[in-house]
Structures are given as structure tokens and as C-alpha cells.
Amino acid sequence: MSDFYADRLFNALERNEVAPGSLLVAAPDLASPEFSRSVILVIEHSHATTFGVNLASRSDLAVANVLPEWTELTAKPQALYIGGPLSQQAVVGLGVTKPGVDIESSTKFNKLANRLVHVDLRVTPDEVRDDLEGMRFFAGYAEWAPGQLNDEIEQGDWYVAPALPSDVLAPGRVDVWGDVMRRQPMPLPLYSTHPSDPSDN
């Protein structure tokens, strides 16, 4: 690897492995406006593909207008989030289980990390109501071809970090990207208030 990307912030830190349930935190200087200050929760990671949803992009559309039957389980703000640029007509459901729920043997959701699950939306809300603390719904997703994400991580575009249930169910007033940056190793907390447009700084 050349030294071309050596001065990127994330390249100075120890690299964590990507896995379902990990976060891809966008670099403060990420050139792509589509992913500026994004926090991607990885849902699947394999040799064939990696895909996930952006926890930090809320739309103005209410879940009640799209999936009214799921409104009661949706954490506030009860809005549909923009998961990514692909297949925005498809909805992805993420949930946080209540403590003590047996995730491993469930056919209603797939475990991502700790109490984070990918919910099968073919089930009814009544089938999972007793298992979940709350849910978040996403229109579309982000996806990487084989080797693409690894290249972007090596370039310093993304920092891989563990996810917390609070990242998925964060209240509307929370800056998810800044919140995640604040709990990472130094010097990342120093960049937690970095604006999406540096000219605003």
C-alpha cells in the first residue's frame, strides 16, 4: 500500500474487523455527499456482499403512512429513515430485543450484535411485540461489491466500530454520527462536532 492515504484520520487507528452488527462510521472528510456523516449498521457481511443501513438519515415520512401496523413498536421519532441509495422502495426493519429474549433460536429475527436484530417483516407486529423494546424502519440500503468495502476502509473512508442498541433507537435530537465518534479512541472524539460542510465551521 502506498502512502497516498497515510494522512487520513482513520488510517492512524487500529483497524477493526467488519461483521454483522458493526458500524461503518464515515470519515469527517468523506468526499461523497451521499454518505457524509453517515453511520452504517452492517446487516450482512460475506465474501459475496456487504450491506447495511444508515442510522443517521431521517426522512420526513412517518412510519404510520407506510407501515401503520408497525407504528406502535417504532421508537420516537416515528419516522422512516433513509437506509441507503439502493432499492428505496424496500423497507428494512431493525429492532432491539428486551433483556433475556432468546435471539439464537428465533425464526422471527436474525441476531446482529448484543440485542440488535434484523426483523423479518413477513411476521406480524403481534408476533414480536413481547420480544422487542423498539424498532426502526429504513427505506433502502447501502451495498458493497466483493472487495469494495475493504478498499474504502484502507483508503480511510470508514472506521469500523461496535454498535450499541442506543444507536438504532436514538431520539431525534441525537446526532448519531457525533455520538458514535465521541465514544471511539482518541483523537476521534475531537472530530465529533465536525460539520458536514467544512465551510460551516
From Swiss-Prot:
Signal sequence bounds: none
Membrane-spanning segments: none
Gene3D superfamilies reported in the protein's UniProt record: VC0467-like
GO CC terms: cytosol
InterPro entries in the record: AlgH-like
Pfam family, any one: DUF179
Taxonomy, superkingdom: Bacteria
Family membership noted in the UniProt record: Belongs to the UPF0301 (AlgH) family.
Entries under HAMAP family matching the protein: UPF0301
Protein name: UPF0301 protein CE2927
